[in-house]
């Protein structure tokens, strides 16, 4: 019985052990193969990522270059479009010399202020004609009163002073009547105050 059990155990155990050993060998080979494939896949992924990154960078660089070129072209076109406008505005707005000439011409055209105290009054000599008691100057632009003698001049002076005083009073009254203040309203007595001021200036 003992020999039979040993024979059966060996007959059954030896093939099972051989099969297990062979399975272990194949499993180890498969594990090594899987590890190699994983390493290859990792390398391939790295290469693909590098290629994708390079392609993306190249595309981005190309887009930047194209956008910069387009912007430079647009700037050049804008500058070319603005040049005639700037030239037109410069031509149209360049007027300093014209203004200087205009100011100079206006300065020459403006008459100089002359004092009224130094007016050359013409004098009538004997033999000259008199037109209604007034003397005309050569340019026929002004009329001056006739002065013939000293007595007449003194009388004329006194009359002129009296006439001046009366005329000043009349003009003051006339201005007082015709005076119209645009800022006057119901709440101000500007005309009354002005009349009182004018009355205070009159001789008493």
UniProtKB/Swiss-Prot annotation:
| Membrane topology listed for this record | Single-pass membrane protein
Q: Where is the signal peptide?
A: none
Q: Give the transmembrane region(s).
A: 6-26
Q: What does this protein do?
A: Involved in cell cycle progression and surviving DNA damage.
Family indicated by similarity? Belongs to the SKG1 family.
Organism the protein comes from: Saccharomyces cerevisiae (strain YJM789) (Baker's yeast)
Q: Where in the cell is it found?
A: Vacuole membrane
Q: Which UniProt keywords apply?
A: Cell cycle, Membrane, Transmembrane, Transmembrane helix, Vacuole
> What GO CC terms are in its UniProt record?
vacuolar membrane
Primary gene name? AIM20
Key word Cell cycle present = yes
Name recorded for this polypeptide: Altered inheritance of mitochondria protein 20
């Amino acid at each position: 019985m003992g020999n039979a059990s040993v024979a059966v155990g060996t007959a059954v155990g030896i093939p099972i052990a051989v099969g297990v050993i062979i399975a272990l060998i194949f499993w180890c080979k498969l594990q090594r193969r899987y590890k190699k494939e994983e390493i290859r896949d990792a390398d391939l992924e790295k290469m693909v990522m590098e290629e994708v990154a390079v392609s993306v960078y190249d595309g981005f660089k190309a887009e930047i270059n194209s956008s910069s070129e387009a912007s430079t072209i647009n700037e050049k076109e804008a500058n070319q479009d603005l040049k005639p406008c700037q030239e037109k505005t410069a031509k149209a707005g360049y007027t300093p010399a014209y203004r200087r000439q205009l100011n100079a011409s206006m300065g020459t055209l403006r008459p100089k202020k002359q004092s009224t105290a130094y007016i050359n009054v013409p004098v009538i000599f004997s033999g000259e004609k008199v037109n209604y008691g007034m003397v005309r100057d050569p340019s026929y632009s002004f009329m001056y009163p006739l002065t013939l003698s000293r007595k007449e001049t003194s009388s004329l002076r006194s009359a002129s002073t009296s006439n001046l005083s009366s005329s000043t009073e009349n003009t003051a009254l006339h201005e007082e009547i015709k005076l119209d203040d645009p800022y006057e309203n119901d709440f101000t007595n500007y005309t009354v105050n002005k009349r009182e001021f004018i009355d205070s200036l009159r001789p008493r």
